[in-house]
Amino acid sequence: NHTVLAEALERWPQQLIEKWLPRIWQILIEISNRYQRALTDYFHGDLSKVAPMAIIWGGEVRMANLCVCACFKINGVSALHSDILKRDVFHDAYARTPDKFTNVTNGIDHRRWLSECNPELDALIRDCCGKDKYLLQPDALKELEQYRDDAGVLSRLGQIKADNKKAFAAWVARESGVILNTDALFDVQVKRLHEYKRQLLNVLHIIYLYQRMKADPHFDFTPRTYLFGAKAAPGYAVAKRIIRLINSVADMIARDPACKDRLQVVFLENYRVSLAEKLMPASELSEQISTAGKEASGTGNMKFMMNGALTIGTMDGANVEICEAVGRDNIFIFGMETPEAEALAASGNYEPMLIYQNDPVIHRVLDQLIRGFGDGVDYTDIANLLLHGGNGGPADRYMSLKDF
């Protein structure tokens, strides 16, 4: 699972498996009985330890526990993810079988996500790093560091990025008729739509920028084109509302002459790998802003950085290791880190309503959600989720207002 959220640790109804997979059910019972006897012996009959680790319990088959029982290795996909698995999600299993747990941080294929999708940058690297040496020995990319002050190489890098932006803008214009401002920074967030990934936090920041521009026409602001791409799970109503919100904000900004050539928001439809291959080389800022402790790793963060985009992110998932690799001077880190976020959530003392009442900037942004964006749609439901919670969950479950 590439998140530590409980919803990703599947639990199947026992009756479903009994009815449709009777032979598998017989095998599961035997595995479960043997495993539960071993757990009972190890924990001296302590049900507070045995029950959470059981495979079949309370009429459910717990798939993650089945995997823990059966697997030779349990592999975290970032250093932080592995630590959370051992410390929290499977802490008793780790205490019993520590040798099972290991870490191999996710990675990407640089031949696909650099050489193939960014041919101009590939040509520059070949000129600087021994032709195609880096394709087989990716550590050869470190040879680029010697050119950090080379005016010719830096100029060529800038031109490559400009060319890629123009190529992507031309493709978007052909596909959708939307004209991107290639003189603005391309600030990109593309990934599965989920509340913990905090596309909503990004939108709230855009609303703030819009309000700031309207209040002060001389606001010194580097022109920015925000690009979103995401798909929501079919039954995930909140995620679909956030997509609608992104489009409402985009339409409002597109209608406002004051935003022309300064601020733009575009939702890229049908985000997919073939689109990503065009987008990554053109991107300049990469939004990796999940709530600390919720993202297992992420690979988009790696694809963006490999194509020269700077990361704006939290210390979550593989961002932690990217930060260690590139140094704090080459990445924009903000927000709570995992221990602080976990402690605040566990304390029950997080009160987003107090933030709303005491922070005039956040107050204005959320009031805009309630008023809407000139298209006849209001987002009171999203404001209520942030301030009051919903569906049995706490207010602002993923602490967007805290990290705003």
State the predicted function of each range.
Residues 1-404:
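A conserved ligand/cofactor-binding region detector
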